[in-house]
Amino acid sequence: MDQLRGASVFPKIDLRSSYHQIRMKEGDISKTGFRTRYGHYEYVVMLFGVTNAPAVFMDYMNRIFRPFLDKFVVMFIDDILIYSRTREEHGEHLRVVLEILKVKQLYTKLSKDEVKFLGHVISAEGIAVDPAKVESVLQWERLRTVTDIRSFVGLTGYYKRFIERFSEIVAPLTQLTRKEQPFIWTDACDRSFDELKRRLTTSPVLVLPDSGEPFDVYCEASHQGLRCVLMQNRKVVTYASRQLKNHERNYPTHDLQLAAVVFALKV
């Protein structure tokens, strides 16, 4: 999402029946055969569910859009996100993308200026968490196994840039995933679980940074971890945090503060 800084127009193009737009090699068609009571059938286009289909399709899309990736195009399988600073610039970007699709005979459908992409909602105001993902987190019942914890932490961790002090809040849960750690659900785990849900439902809209404007970086260190927030024009661009490594727990205060500065500058 960092490529989108400074942009304000975000159309998304979805390819129709994406895999079916790639023809099978002649020698592989017979491998897809199946029989029904109506007869024998074989796929002449790439079918959904094949192990290598996503990789093959992604490789093809990356090759045809390679000159424009991270300039004004972001690709994820059959989703093409175009980002532009102005509507005039957007017109040229859209023309280039549509021309490539026309030449390659790929058929599409267009989305609106506010689009959902990789679990985020992107608009001129910034980036927000997809409400559908928030709903799935809210419906999560109490975690009863290490696998449950890893799944929950993995999903909420995907949105950690929206959550201030994420690493500190999640610490009681990650503690239970460590090797040889007995699974004992405590009040601290309950508070962590509930707080992560609350933070996701109240997460801010993160602004898309403008490289031409100054940034403000705020950082903090404690024995609970390192934390920082990147802001621009008094609006949050991203939160970041991490737990301390074992050797860092022995740092004196001034070294911890310096570690927080280094961590913030690497975000």
Where are these regions (language model features)?
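Catalytic palm subdomain of template-directed nucleic-acid polymerases
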Residues: 20-23, 61, 66-105, 116-126, ...
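C-terminal reverse transcriptase regions that engage the nucleic-acid substrate
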Residues: 5, 52, 60, 70-71, ...
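Acidic, metal-ligating active-site segments
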Residues: 224-232
